[in-house]
A protein has these predicted regions:
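Structured catalytic/translocation cores of nucleotide/phosphate-coupled proteins
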Residues: 22-23, 27-28, 32, 45, ...
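Catalytic cores and adjacent binding grooves of peptidoglycan-active enzymes
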Residues: 63-137
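Active-site acidic/histidine clusters and adjacent loop/turn architecture
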Residues: 1-36
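Extended, low-complexity, intrinsically disordered C-terminal regulatory tails
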Residues: 26-55, 104, 112-114
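Polar low-complexity intrinsically disordered regions enriched in Ser/Thr and small residues
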Residues: 9, 57, 115-116
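Cytochrome P450 catalytic domain signature, combining two hallmark sequence patches
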Residues: 54-64
Length: 137
């Protein structure tokens, strides 16, 4: 079975920088796990809402989701058994696929489960955003 993004994921992905679009499309084409792109560019009202709710640690315009004309971040959420899954294991599996591919095709990204980019993901973080992937320079 060949996986493909739905219309909403495609629309969200098209708001992101081309290297991220390329990475996410190739990650889906590997056919190891289905996933959706729930966000690319994030407008001010939504960034403010996420900050107030503790879902983001940064205010507008300091998130890589807030960069225009093309966002430097996407939220990629596993799609399992016909629905979005924020399950820890599903998110970590997807992150492994995306991070390995990012190294292979030289599109450096930082994952929201390893903000400090060390060799200890998740356990040494005080804020995990397991569906967040951003271009890293």
């Amino acid at each position: 079975m060949t996986l493909y993004f739905g219309k909403r994921s495609e629309a969200n992905l098209e708001t992101a920088a081309l290297p991220l679009q390329h990475l996410m499309r190739q990650a889906l084409a590997i056919n190891l796990i289905d996933f959706s792109i729930t966000e690319g560019f994030r407008p001010r009202f939504k960034q403010d809402e996420y900050f107030a709710a503790g879902k983001s640690k940064v205010r507008w315009p300091n998130s890589k989701h807030n960069i225009q004309p093309y966002s430097e971040a996407v939220d990629a959420v596993p799609y399992v058994r016909g629905k979005l899954s924020y399950n820890y294991y599903h998110c970590c599996f997807l992150a492994g696929v995306i991070l390995a591919l990012s190294k292979k095709i030289s599109v450096p990204v930082r994952w929201g489960g390893n903000w400090d980019m060390d060799l200890e993901p998740i356990t040494d973080q005080d804020f995990n955003d397991l569906v967040h992937f951003e271009l890293y320079k």
